[in-house]
Amino acid sequence: NLLITDNIAKYYSINIKYGELNWLNIGSYSFNSEIKKTDNKFFTIDYKNTLRSFDINDGTELWNFQTDDIFTMPDSKNSLIIVGNLVIFNNSIGDITAVDVETGQITWQLPTQSSNIINESYNFKTSKLVSDGKSIFFSNNKEEFYSIDIKTGVTNWINDINSILTPLVIGNIIFTVSEKGYLLSLIHI
């Protein structure tokens, strides 16, 4: 089955083999992230910075987790990853949040920007989140490249790199490209 969310608040499932609609539902707000799937659930984030968990069989909402909202519509998509029993995601003001896959209960949250970002969020952009299973890596257009511990949400380190491209993790080496076009490699110990 193909799972789809769109920018007019619809989410649906299509049978790939026959091209038939399995189910269609309409949410409260448009969606602003990719879809991630695990077992019988899928996850997405809407424009109100709410992570939503849906049943894959009929689209029923299982739970949701609201983070801080903003007054403007961001022009970049939010990112989410699933690592073990956690869904880890960013919102449009730079918070990184980890919640339990089954219950939606918060495990940790890390604000990466000052409260002033709410007024500047239309201009704030981040890369997609990536993980090596122990840490999360991402960067933003505020010259910050982060490594965050998955279990605790504690910042391992921050480097001065201005990039919104998705980092690539190969072993203990992280590759990214800066806004100025430089290929950078970081060794993560």
Outline where the language-model segments fall.
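Structural signature of WD-repeat beta-propellers
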Residues: D6-N7, D46-Y47, G84, N91-S92, ...
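Beta-propeller domains
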Residues: F138-Y146, T152-T155, S163-T166
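Extracytoplasmic beta-rich repeat domains
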Residues: N1, E20-D39, T60-G84, Q105-G133, ...
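Conserved small/polar residues in nucleotide/adenosyl-binding loops
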Residues: I187-I189
